[in-house]
């Protein structure tokens, strides 16, 4: 059975959901991606960030410079190799990310609570579990 219509609808709905989350964010997408990576992985070099994000090192250097100017990241010497500099999320950057996540979670919680009944919430949970299986490797 051809699942193309389901795949297309899923892609559209997920894209709409992502756009809705981005509405509550003041940080541009490239900077947000870097902050998310730093929250997950901890301090890393600009070249490592570029490789992880799939961008040129020059582009990443520009993004990191913007984050440094905004006070959202800090730069430190690598204790293992003093020739390299590590980029680390700052306390302000961490606060911004936590606040964004809190706002996004509150919006989703409110939408689920007010727009879905108990049975629909169970169905949504089952759907999330299925979607997770689609992306788990």
What are these regions (language model features)?
Residues 1-7, 118-137:
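C-terminal regulatory/oligomerization modules of transcriptional regulators
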Residues 12-16, 33-39, 95, 122:
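Pre-recognition alpha-helix immediately N-terminal to the DNA-recognition helix
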Residues 18-59, 70, 86:
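N-terminal helix-turn-helix DNA-binding core of bacterial DNA-binding proteins
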């Amino acid at each position: 059975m051809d699942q193309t219509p389901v795949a297309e609808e899923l892609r559209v709905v997920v894209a709409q959901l992502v756009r809705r989350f981005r509405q509550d964010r003041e940080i541009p997408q490239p900077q947000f991606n870097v902050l998310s990576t730093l929250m997950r992985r901890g301090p890393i070099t600009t070249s490592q960030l570029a490789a992880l994000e799939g961008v040129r090192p020059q582009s990443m250097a520009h993004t990191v410079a913007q984050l440094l100017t905004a006070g959202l990241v800090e730069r430190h010497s690598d204790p293992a190799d003093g020739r390299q500099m590590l980029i680390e999320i700052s306390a302000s950057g961490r606060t911004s990310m936590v606040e964004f996540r809190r706002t996004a979670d509150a919006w989703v919680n409110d939408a689920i609570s007010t727009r879905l009944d108990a049975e629909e919430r169970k169905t949504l949970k089952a759907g999330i579990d299925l979607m997770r299986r689609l992306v788990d490797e």
